[in-house]
A protein has these predicted regions:
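Short, charged/polar micro-motifs that form catalytic or ligand-binding hotspots
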Residues: 40, 90, 237, 241
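Short amphipathic alpha-helical face segments that pack within enzyme cores
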Residues: 45-52, 99, 246, 250
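Generic non-transmembrane alpha-helix signal with a bias for helix starts/N-cap capping motifs
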Residues: 47, 83, 97, 229-230
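C-terminal accessory/binding modules appended to enzymatic or scaffolding proteins
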Residues: 207-255
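Hydrophobic residues within well-ordered alpha-helices
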Residues: 50, 143, 179, 214-215, ...
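Active-site cores that bind ATP or allylic diphosphates and position pyrophosphate for catalysis
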Residues: 1-66, 72-78, 86
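Catalytic adenosine-cofactor/nucleotide-binding cores of aminoacyl-tRNA synthetases and other
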Residues: 57-201, 256-283
Length: 283
Protein backbone atom coordinates (compact mmCIF):
# COMPACT_ATOMS: atom_id res chain seq x y z
CA UNK A 1 0.00 0.00 0.00
CA UNK A 2 1.03 3.59 -0.55
CA UNK A 3 0.52 6.64 1.58
CA UNK A 4 -0.54 9.41 -0.83
CA UNK A 5 1.64 11.80 1.19
CA UNK A 6 4.69 9.93 -0.09
CA UNK A 7 3.71 10.33 -3.72
CA UNK A 8 4.51 13.36 -5.82
CA UNK A 9 1.89 14.74 -8.16
CA UNK A 10 2.16 12.87 -11.47
CA UNK A 11 2.47 14.80 -14.69
CA UNK A 12 -0.52 13.86 -16.86
CA UNK A 13 -0.27 16.41 -19.68
CA UNK A 14 2.88 17.96 -21.12
CA UNK A 15 3.21 21.66 -21.64
CA UNK A 16 2.56 21.19 -25.36
CA UNK A 17 -0.75 19.45 -24.61
CA UNK A 18 0.33 15.89 -25.38
CA UNK A 19 -0.57 13.20 -22.88
CA UNK A 20 1.85 11.18 -20.81
CA UNK A 21 1.44 7.47 -20.04
CA UNK A 22 -0.78 7.56 -16.95
CA UNK A 23 -4.11 9.01 -18.12
CA UNK A 24 -4.30 7.24 -21.52
CA UNK A 25 -3.40 3.96 -19.83
CA UNK A 26 -6.23 4.22 -17.32
CA UNK A 27 -8.77 5.40 -19.92
CA UNK A 28 -7.79 2.52 -22.20
CA UNK A 29 -8.28 0.04 -19.35
CA UNK A 30 -11.71 1.50 -18.63
CA UNK A 31 -12.76 1.43 -22.28
CA UNK A 32 -11.57 -2.16 -22.71
CA UNK A 33 -13.21 -3.20 -19.42
CA UNK A 34 -9.93 -4.59 -18.10
CA UNK A 35 -10.41 -6.51 -14.85
CA UNK A 36 -6.85 -7.69 -14.08
CA UNK A 37 -3.52 -5.99 -14.71
CA UNK A 38 -0.19 -7.80 -14.28
CA UNK A 39 3.02 -5.89 -14.84
CA UNK A 40 6.57 -5.55 -13.56
CA UNK A 41 7.41 -4.48 -10.04
CA UNK A 42 8.92 -1.29 -11.48
CA UNK A 43 5.31 -0.17 -12.04
CA UNK A 44 4.26 -0.35 -8.39
CA UNK A 45 4.44 3.42 -7.95
CA UNK A 46 2.52 3.90 -11.20
CA UNK A 47 -0.18 1.59 -9.87
CA UNK A 48 -0.69 3.93 -6.93
CA UNK A 49 -1.16 6.84 -9.33
CA UNK A 50 -3.51 4.85 -11.54
CA UNK A 51 -5.73 3.77 -8.67
CA UNK A 52 -6.23 7.44 -7.81
CA UNK A 53 -7.10 8.21 -11.43
CA UNK A 54 -9.59 5.32 -11.51
CA UNK A 55 -11.19 6.74 -8.37
CA UNK A 56 -11.25 10.26 -9.81
CA UNK A 57 -13.03 8.94 -12.91
CA UNK A 58 -15.45 6.98 -10.69
CA UNK A 59 -14.55 3.73 -12.42
CA UNK A 60 -14.08 0.21 -11.10
CA UNK A 61 -10.50 -0.47 -10.07
CA UNK A 62 -8.93 -3.56 -11.67
CA UNK A 63 -7.07 -6.13 -9.63
CA UNK A 64 -3.35 -5.35 -9.83
CA UNK A 65 -0.43 -7.74 -9.52
CA UNK A 66 3.28 -7.17 -10.00
CA UNK A 67 5.82 -9.77 -11.05
CA UNK A 68 9.51 -9.63 -10.05
CA UNK A 69 12.35 -8.66 -12.33
CA UNK A 70 14.20 -11.13 -14.51
CA UNK A 71 17.91 -11.51 -13.74
CA UNK A 72 20.73 -13.44 -15.41
CA UNK A 73 22.58 -16.37 -13.87
CA UNK A 74 25.05 -13.98 -12.22
CA UNK A 75 22.21 -12.12 -10.54
CA UNK A 76 22.41 -9.06 -12.78
CA UNK A 77 19.40 -7.37 -14.30
CA UNK A 78 18.69 -7.27 -18.02
CA UNK A 79 18.80 -4.01 -19.89
CA UNK A 80 16.15 -3.11 -22.42
CA UNK A 81 19.06 -2.50 -24.75
CA UNK A 82 19.97 -6.19 -24.74
CA UNK A 83 18.20 -6.90 -28.01
CA UNK A 84 19.06 -10.60 -28.09
CA UNK A 85 16.82 -11.22 -25.07
CA UNK A 86 13.52 -10.71 -26.84
CA UNK A 87 10.62 -12.95 -27.77
CA UNK A 88 11.21 -12.10 -31.42
CA UNK A 89 14.81 -13.30 -31.31
CA UNK A 90 13.92 -16.41 -29.35
CA UNK A 91 11.41 -17.31 -32.07
CA UNK A 92 14.01 -16.65 -34.77
CA UNK A 93 16.31 -19.10 -32.99
CA UNK A 94 13.59 -21.72 -33.24
CA UNK A 95 12.00 -21.82 -29.81
CA UNK A 96 8.40 -23.01 -29.91
CA UNK A 97 5.73 -20.50 -28.84
CA UNK A 98 4.43 -22.84 -26.17
CA UNK A 99 7.95 -23.33 -24.79
CA UNK A 100 8.41 -19.59 -24.34
CA UNK A 101 4.99 -19.18 -22.74
CA UNK A 102 5.58 -22.12 -20.42
CA UNK A 103 9.05 -21.03 -19.34
CA UNK A 104 8.41 -17.35 -18.73
CA UNK A 105 5.05 -17.96 -17.08
CA UNK A 106 6.44 -20.29 -14.43
CA UNK A 107 10.01 -19.03 -14.01
CA UNK A 108 10.36 -17.54 -10.54
CA UNK A 109 7.31 -19.37 -9.23
CA UNK A 110 6.92 -22.34 -6.91
CA UNK A 111 5.53 -24.37 -9.83
CA UNK A 112 7.94 -26.77 -11.50
CA UNK A 113 8.85 -25.94 -15.08
CA UNK A 114 8.15 -29.09 -17.05
CA UNK A 115 7.50 -29.68 -20.76
CA UNK A 116 3.88 -29.03 -21.76
CA UNK A 117 2.51 -29.26 -25.29
CA UNK A 118 -1.01 -27.95 -24.74
CA UNK A 119 -2.14 -24.42 -23.91
CA UNK A 120 -5.09 -25.64 -21.85
CA UNK A 121 -2.73 -27.52 -19.55
CA UNK A 122 -0.71 -24.35 -19.00
CA UNK A 123 -3.84 -22.35 -18.20
CA UNK A 124 -5.02 -24.95 -15.71
CA UNK A 125 -1.60 -25.07 -14.06
CA UNK A 126 -1.11 -21.31 -13.67
CA UNK A 127 -1.76 -19.80 -10.25
CA UNK A 128 -0.55 -16.26 -9.74
CA UNK A 129 -0.23 -16.83 -5.99
CA UNK A 130 2.69 -19.16 -6.76
CA UNK A 131 4.82 -16.34 -8.15
CA UNK A 132 7.72 -15.50 -5.85
CA UNK A 133 8.49 -11.97 -4.71
CA UNK A 134 12.16 -12.60 -5.45
CA UNK A 135 13.71 -11.91 -8.84
CA UNK A 136 13.46 -14.76 -11.33
CA UNK A 137 16.75 -16.14 -12.65
CA UNK A 138 16.83 -16.72 -16.41
CA UNK A 139 18.87 -19.62 -17.81
CA UNK A 140 19.26 -19.97 -21.57
CA UNK A 141 20.45 -23.54 -21.05
CA UNK A 142 17.24 -24.42 -19.20
CA UNK A 143 15.13 -22.83 -21.94
CA UNK A 144 16.94 -24.82 -24.63
CA UNK A 145 16.47 -28.03 -22.66
CA UNK A 146 12.77 -27.29 -22.21
CA UNK A 147 12.32 -26.77 -25.94
CA UNK A 148 13.99 -30.10 -26.68
CA UNK A 149 11.76 -31.92 -24.18
CA UNK A 150 8.65 -30.14 -25.46
CA UNK A 151 9.27 -31.32 -29.03
CA UNK A 152 9.38 -34.90 -27.74
CA UNK A 153 5.77 -34.46 -26.60
CA UNK A 154 4.47 -33.20 -29.95
CA UNK A 155 2.51 -35.68 -32.01
CA UNK A 156 2.62 -35.60 -35.78
CA UNK A 157 -0.59 -33.58 -36.13
CA UNK A 158 0.98 -30.78 -34.08
CA UNK A 159 3.90 -30.30 -36.46
CA UNK A 160 2.81 -31.64 -39.86
CA UNK A 161 1.98 -28.18 -41.23
CA UNK A 162 5.49 -27.03 -40.32
CA UNK A 163 7.31 -29.69 -42.34
CA UNK A 164 5.38 -29.51 -45.62
CA UNK A 165 8.55 -28.15 -47.27
CA UNK A 166 10.24 -31.54 -46.88
CA UNK A 167 10.24 -34.23 -49.55
CA UNK A 168 6.98 -36.16 -49.68
CA UNK A 169 8.37 -39.32 -48.11
CA UNK A 170 9.50 -37.27 -45.10
CA UNK A 171 6.10 -35.66 -44.53
CA UNK A 172 5.08 -38.72 -42.56
CA UNK A 173 4.44 -39.64 -38.96
CA UNK A 174 7.20 -42.23 -39.18
CA UNK A 175 9.77 -39.53 -39.98
CA UNK A 176 8.61 -37.46 -37.01
CA UNK A 177 8.91 -40.46 -34.71
CA UNK A 178 12.39 -40.99 -36.13
CA UNK A 179 13.71 -37.48 -35.41
CA UNK A 180 11.65 -36.06 -32.53
CA UNK A 181 13.89 -37.39 -29.76
CA UNK A 182 17.05 -36.18 -31.47
CA UNK A 183 16.34 -32.51 -32.18
CA UNK A 184 16.41 -29.41 -30.04
CA UNK A 185 14.70 -27.10 -32.53
CA UNK A 186 12.16 -28.03 -35.20
CA UNK A 187 14.27 -26.59 -38.02
CA UNK A 188 16.77 -29.39 -37.38
CA UNK A 189 14.46 -31.74 -39.32
CA UNK A 190 16.01 -30.14 -42.41
CA UNK A 191 19.43 -31.51 -41.44
CA UNK A 192 18.01 -34.97 -40.80
CA UNK A 193 16.31 -34.94 -44.18
CA UNK A 194 19.72 -34.34 -45.78
CA UNK A 195 21.38 -36.99 -43.61
CA UNK A 196 18.82 -39.60 -44.58
CA UNK A 197 18.78 -38.64 -48.26
CA UNK A 198 22.56 -38.83 -48.65
CA UNK A 199 24.06 -42.03 -50.01
CA UNK A 200 27.23 -42.80 -48.03
CA UNK A 201 30.11 -44.88 -49.33
CA UNK A 202 30.38 -47.66 -46.77
CA UNK A 203 34.07 -48.09 -47.69
CA UNK A 204 34.72 -44.74 -46.01
CA UNK A 205 33.80 -46.42 -42.73
CA UNK A 206 35.96 -49.52 -43.26
CA UNK A 207 32.91 -51.77 -43.41
CA UNK A 208 33.59 -55.24 -44.77
CA UNK A 209 32.29 -55.95 -48.27
CA UNK A 210 31.02 -59.35 -47.21
CA UNK A 211 28.87 -57.77 -44.48
CA UNK A 212 27.29 -55.39 -46.98
CA UNK A 213 26.67 -58.23 -49.44
CA UNK A 214 24.84 -60.24 -46.78
CA UNK A 215 22.83 -57.20 -45.64
CA UNK A 216 21.65 -56.67 -49.22
CA UNK A 217 20.96 -60.36 -49.74
CA UNK A 218 18.66 -60.77 -46.72
CA UNK A 219 16.92 -57.39 -47.00
CA UNK A 220 13.15 -58.11 -46.78
CA UNK A 221 10.81 -57.12 -49.55
CA UNK A 222 8.94 -53.85 -49.28
CA UNK A 223 6.70 -52.27 -48.20
CA UNK A 224 8.63 -51.77 -44.98
CA UNK A 225 7.21 -51.06 -41.55
CA UNK A 226 8.61 -50.64 -38.04
CA UNK A 227 9.08 -54.41 -37.71
CA UNK A 228 11.31 -54.62 -40.79
CA UNK A 229 14.41 -53.49 -38.88
CA UNK A 230 14.21 -56.37 -36.39
CA UNK A 231 13.52 -58.90 -39.13
CA UNK A 232 16.42 -57.61 -41.24
CA UNK A 233 18.99 -57.43 -38.44
CA UNK A 234 17.97 -60.85 -37.17
CA UNK A 235 18.64 -62.31 -40.62
CA UNK A 236 22.03 -60.57 -40.82
CA UNK A 237 22.90 -61.88 -37.37
CA UNK A 238 22.05 -65.44 -38.41
CA UNK A 239 24.27 -65.15 -41.48
CA UNK A 240 27.26 -63.35 -39.90
CA UNK A 241 27.14 -64.22 -36.23
CA UNK A 242 27.51 -60.50 -35.47
CA UNK A 243 25.54 -58.98 -32.62
CA UNK A 244 25.33 -55.79 -30.61
CA UNK A 245 27.53 -52.93 -31.78
CA UNK A 246 29.29 -55.09 -34.39
CA UNK A 247 25.91 -55.67 -36.02
CA UNK A 248 24.18 -52.33 -35.61
CA UNK A 249 27.00 -49.77 -36.03
CA UNK A 250 27.87 -50.67 -39.65
CA UNK A 251 24.20 -50.43 -40.61
CA UNK A 252 23.80 -47.08 -38.85
CA UNK A 253 26.85 -45.68 -40.64
CA UNK A 254 25.63 -46.95 -44.00
CA UNK A 255 22.11 -45.59 -43.55
CA UNK A 256 22.88 -42.23 -41.89
CA UNK A 257 26.63 -41.64 -42.01
CA UNK A 258 26.51 -40.97 -38.27
CA UNK A 259 27.64 -43.16 -35.34
CA UNK A 260 24.60 -42.25 -33.29
CA UNK A 261 21.09 -40.92 -33.72
CA UNK A 262 17.43 -41.94 -33.75
CA UNK A 263 16.04 -45.46 -33.71
CA UNK A 264 16.58 -47.02 -37.11
CA UNK A 265 13.34 -48.99 -37.00
CA UNK A 266 11.62 -45.67 -37.80
CA UNK A 267 14.05 -44.91 -40.64
CA UNK A 268 13.50 -48.06 -42.70
CA UNK A 269 9.80 -47.35 -43.52
CA UNK A 270 10.82 -44.06 -45.15
CA UNK A 271 12.30 -46.01 -48.06
CA UNK A 272 11.37 -48.75 -50.48
CA UNK A 273 13.71 -51.68 -51.08
CA UNK A 274 15.56 -49.93 -53.90
CA UNK A 275 16.22 -46.98 -51.62
CA UNK A 276 17.94 -49.18 -49.03
CA UNK A 277 19.83 -51.11 -51.71
CA UNK A 278 21.08 -47.80 -53.07
CA UNK A 279 22.46 -46.92 -49.63
CA UNK A 280 24.12 -50.34 -49.57
CA UNK A 281 25.79 -49.49 -52.88
CA UNK A 282 23.95 -52.21 -54.77
CA UNK A 283 22.12 -49.93 -57.21
Amino acid sequence: SFDPKNLSDPVLIREDGTLLYHLPSVIDDIEEKITHIIRGEDHIANTAYHIQIFNALESNIPIFAHHPFLIDEEGKGFSKRVGSLSIENFKKEGFENITLLNYFLFIGSSSNIEPIDDLTKIINKFDISNISQSSAKFSKESLVSLNKDTLKLFNFDQIKDKIIHLQNNFQKETFWRFVKNNITFLHEVNSWEKVISNVNNYKDFNIDNAFVDIAAEVLPNDPFDENTWDIWTSSIKDKTGFKGKDLFMPLRLILTGKPNGPELKYLIPLFDKNGILQKLGKI
